[in-house]
Amino acid sequence: MAGRKSSRTTGEPVKKAERKSAILSPHDELRERLLETSLDVKENIPERSSSTRNESVGSQRSDCSESRKRRSTEKGPVAKRPSTEKKGNGSRDDSFSSVFSEDRETESSVGSTSSRTRGQPLPAMPEEEESLDGSSDHNAESEESRETPQSDEHDGFEEDGDVEDDVSSDVNDEEDEYDEYEEDEETEDEFDLPLQNDDFAVTKRLMNDRHMIDAPSLLSYGKCEGIGSPTKVWSLMVKRDDIPRATRQLLRNHPDMTINMRRVLVDWMMECCDVEKLHRETFHLAVDYADRFLESTREEVISENFQLVGTAALFIAAKYEEIYPPKCADLAALTDGAFSCDDICRMESIVAKDLKWSFGPITSVQWLSTYLQLLGTGKKNNDHFEEGNMYIPELLRSEYLRMVRILDYLLSDIDSFNFSYRTIAAAVLFVNYDPRSAVEKATGFIYEQLRNVIDYVTPICRAYDRFTQEHVPKDIIPDYAPAEDAHNIQVHIKHYEVDPYVEKERERRHRRGPNRRL
């Protein structure tokens, strides 16, 4: 906008550049001096009438509107940052005109009522504590204000912009930290939320229990390399085994079913595993699924669909354990056309929902394999070799096969539900392996702790020894399986042929007494 002339007593026109430089100067001392100069100059400006002031303001607004229209049609949108370039008519940019017009209106209204007495000290600035030198001349101050370059004003704007950028970056950093803190709180809250699955809630409580169980002495740090400490690994395994399995009352909701029918179902599932060349762990998982389903389901299972439950459990276990599980059509063919693939899939969904998707128990076969791995680790005879999780087994596969066949038979016996998988595997190892001290170091149990379980499994172990001597079973190790995995393939054994030997051993042990050492 065009500058205005005022009638002063001194006759010297006042340049607006002096006032603007005083306001926009980034230097503290210079800014304070120029402020004092501008106030002194303002005293000599006569009071204007309201009509003159309104006319000047109107002309400023018209100039601004015309310049904006001209700029919008010729040069595109207006830049966000104010420019400090002067125009040909001596006026500042449009963005400054509105700011300084408001300043003049405020200063003129205030100047008419109150004015500072010349020589009165200025109030101290909040950011400054140093006092100015009183010997400085007023003319020198005015000359400094006139000689202040325009680049200082531009630098002031840039410095102000840098300060604003720094403040905005600090605010963004604080917001990022606050967002991370909120995410951490949300993660902790999600971890503390209760689980909808009751079985998973029990598993979570057991796994997160701070009470640790001492690991067996044979479970060293070298064998747990890359997994965790022996104490924590063993504690997690033991707590996982504390999740209850099925009980002897699993058929109470199914009056049409009998214990003998369950044994027939288990024998048929074993035969299916033999035909499909499935692993022994698959067979044990399938029997566990079927038993838990029969105990937990509220719907009555009748004799017509009793085999369907075992087929669905076998289908789930194969998909959980096997690399190449059998197809549903293959299992349907094993039922001799009694059930279709749709029937098996529907029952599979029912069993999975009733088990609440808990498919990972540690079976007796897994516990026995763990114990034998600890027992089969030879002592380190050479100090140049470091102990690790790789070992050379000292036990023969024939010993392993003899013990796992006993576990297969115990799986079909209803009395085995009185004990956990872990204790049954340890008891079988106590009966079939010497010395006891080595078994105690591998299992973490003392012989006296498992007295009841040992008394239960001893007749069965002795019966299998006699049965093996008289009737050598065929295909103990199948020829169709790879040599390194042949002992893990399930082989069908007719348990009803072993029952007479078990009864004889139990009667003999009853006559001799259970406390006699074998």
From Swiss-Prot:
Residues 1-193 are annotated as: Disordered. Residues 13-46, 82-107, 135-154 have a biased composition (Basic and acidic residues). Residues 108-119 have a biased composition (Low complexity). Residues 47-62 have a biased composition (Polar residues). SUPFAM superfamilies: Cyclin-like. Residues 155-192 have a biased composition (Acidic residues). One of its GO terms (biological process) is gonad development. It is found in: Nucleus; Cytoplasm, Cytoskeleton, Microtubule organizing center, Centrosome, Centriole. SMART domains: CYCLIN. Gene3D superfamilies: Cyclin-like (1.10.472.10). Its main location: nucleus. Keywords: Cell cycle, Cell division, Cyclin, Cytoplasm, Cytoskeleton, Meiosis, Mitosis, Nucleus. GO terms for cellular component: centriole; chromatin; cyclin E1-CDK2 complex; cytoplasm; microtubule organizing center; nucleus. One of its GO terms (molecular function) is cyclin-dependent protein serine/threonine kinase regulator activity. Disulfide bonds: none annotated. Interacts with a member of the CDK2/CDK protein kinases to form a serine/threonine kinase holoenzyme complex. The cyclin subunit imparts substrate specificity to the complex. Belongs to the cyclin family. Cyclin E subfamily. Essential for the control of the cell cycle at the G1/S (start) transition. In association with cdk-2, regulates proliferation, quiescent state and cell fate during the development of several cell lineages. In the embryo, initiates the establishment of cell polarity through the recruitment of the centrosomal proteins spd-2 and spd-5 during prophase. During the development of the vulva, controls the onset of vulval cell terminal differentiation by controlling the duration of G1 phase. During hypoderm development at early larval stages, controls syncytial fate of seam cell daughter cells. This is G1/S-specific cyclin-E.
